[in-house]
Amino acid sequence: MKIFFVSSSFIALEVFKEILRHYEVVGVLTLPDKPKGRGQKLSQNVIKVEAIAKDIKVFDPLILDNNTLNSIRDLNPDLMLVFSYGKIFKKEFLDIFRMGCINVHPSLLPKYRGVSPIQSAILNGDCVSGITIQSMALEMDSGNILVQKKFKIRSYDTSYDISKLVSSLSPSLVLEALEKISKGFLGIPQKSSEATFCSFLKKELGFIDFNLSSFEIKNRINACNPWPLVRAKLDYSDIIFHRADFWEIDLYKERKVGEIVDFDPERGLFVNTGKGILFLLEVQRPGRRVLDFKSFYNGSRQLIGRVFSSVGGIY
């Protein structure tokens, strides 16, 4: 089976490596190089770097024009495997692959069709999510289900944590799906009536309101890591929140929302909210390294009684 691989993200790297061990990859489609760092030098994504190292033909066009389509067609690929590319394909392109096209989607489809399934699951406080290997259809994320696997989301897991988990779990699921396809399995249709949808995260999610419940704030902090990252002001300094947990019991009703009310070396830095206690676990001052809550507490002047204020934005 000749496979054409499509991705632009680190989350797909382990799948790419595993496919290379078991199948012939005849080409890779990825996004163009992007400016990165202070010097804004063009940087290749990890998929492109790996493909070039393995001497695999790479395509990175802004648009899939006829010349690109013909070049891909000339490779005689049997199947296309897509994992985190970020663009929708037309029927003309999908029809190139005689054995069809499959996609790795990090949710339990039909839940969270769209571009931010990991972040959306955390933002909504889900305790369980998963990975779906689906056949591709013209309607986004509506294809037949080939393989699904559930996993738990811990209360303090971030989007980055779950992305790494998905990266590690996906290779074996993709191999299972390819084996099923080789035996003629067409997959199980989704129940479209149960479909939910998710869109791109907005930068405004990083603007926090401490009048929200600790559950909502915790979800937002963890969902927004690594982007856009939630922040608040402590006196006149920005503090970036990277990880949090919560306790939705009101112990400090008489204290201000946003006030640092306690420190527990086992649970975190306690911040009062509109409902319950937010446990800050990892924080950062702009331009400095990320600190666990103990290091932040020990390295700061008296924190108890100081109040976080919201950075302006849309709630």
Swiss-Prot record:
Keyword list, A-Z: Protein biosynthesis, Transferase
Binding site for (6S)-5,6,7,8-tetrahydrofolate: S107, L108, L109, P110
GO cellular component, one term: cytosol
UniProt key word Lipoprotein: no
CDD domains: FMT_core_Met-tRNA-FMT_N (cd08646), Met_tRNA_FMT_C (cd08704)
First-tier enzyme category under EC: transferase
NCBIfam families tied to this protein: fmt (TIGR00460)
Family, similarity comment: Belongs to the Fmt family.
Protein name: Methionyl-tRNA formyltransferase
